[in-house]
Amino acid sequence: MQTHHWPAQQRVHAGVGALAALPKELDAFGWQRPLLITTNSLIRSGMAERVRALLGDRCAGMVADIPAHSPLESVARLVAKFGETRADGVVALGGGSVIDATKGMLVALGAGLQASDITGKALTGASGGGTSAWGTDFSRPRMIAVPTTLSAAEFTSFGGVTDTAAGRKLMVGHPLAVPVVVIQDPSCTLDTPAELLLSTGARSVDHSVEGFCAPNASPISDATAIEAARRMWSALPRMHADPTDLAARSDAQAAAWLSIQGRSGGVSHGASHGIGYLLGGGFNVPHGLTSCVMLPAVLRCDGR
């Protein structure tokens, strides 16, 4: 028997101009005090201000000091800020590190943890449900994600946070930690450094290939993995050749979405992902780069 799980997401807005849907989504959920979580680089580029302007007077505050690999210390700061600002929802603007740190915060808040409670053991203990159930506590705070990379973290209910003291990555999650709404606007990726954007596109190829090769792959995961790889293989060279090509960026975002359908549905990953978690948590190597290096080597090993 094969079982495919669907994430507890309501809507995905995709394409040029999709960011304009954000105020209507705030209205739909009745959020009066959303907290904006982003990065310092997106503040410097002006992208964070563009999103903050859409939030208007409702914006409860902004947190921007989210380092790569979502350290536990960042999760603790987010938990504290959410309480201090009396926020009622979250808008996460950024890549996988921002979105995963926000997932960690949502897991902690759902379990009633305070900032001082945030340890690796406490956060993994608060995680539950995986992809097997949506749960029943729909009073939990939720996230709207505006991705600026191609990591596809916005389509899963789980994420990686780093215990810097131990030098390892921890997987945390809850069915309702997945963003309830995703806004894929290619213009939101224009300020992302080329190396980061292109390497996270390679990470999506890694999702596709390892998902297709997984022993518990399904017809759904196979179909989406093949189409994701085809689209990304076409989009990445076009993005590299013309950084202003929004059609190529939109195709890459669609490919990222497709690439993670197997993983978010319960399909296992392979050694490239596993080694990537070790390198990321222990040595702060970006996951996009670990995929570029490890996937070819893992495939050669698997093919023997």
Residue spans of the language-model regions?
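Short Gly/Thr/Asp-enriched flexible loops that form oxyanion-binding sites at enzyme active sites
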Residues: 48-51, 78-79, 98-111, 156-157
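A glycine/threonine-rich phosphate-anchoring loop and its flanking beta-alpha core
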Residues: 20, 24, 110-219
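Glycine/serine-rich anion-binding loops at beta->alpha junctions
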Residues: 87-105, 148-153, 285
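Active-site segments that bind and position negatively charged phosphate/pyrophosphate groups
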Residues: 211-304
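Acidic, glycine-rich active-site loops and adjacent beta-strand->loop/helix elements
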Residues: 69, 97, 105-109, 122-123, ...
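Acidic-glycine-rich active-site phosphate/pyrophosphate-binding loop
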Residues: 79, 175-182, 266-273
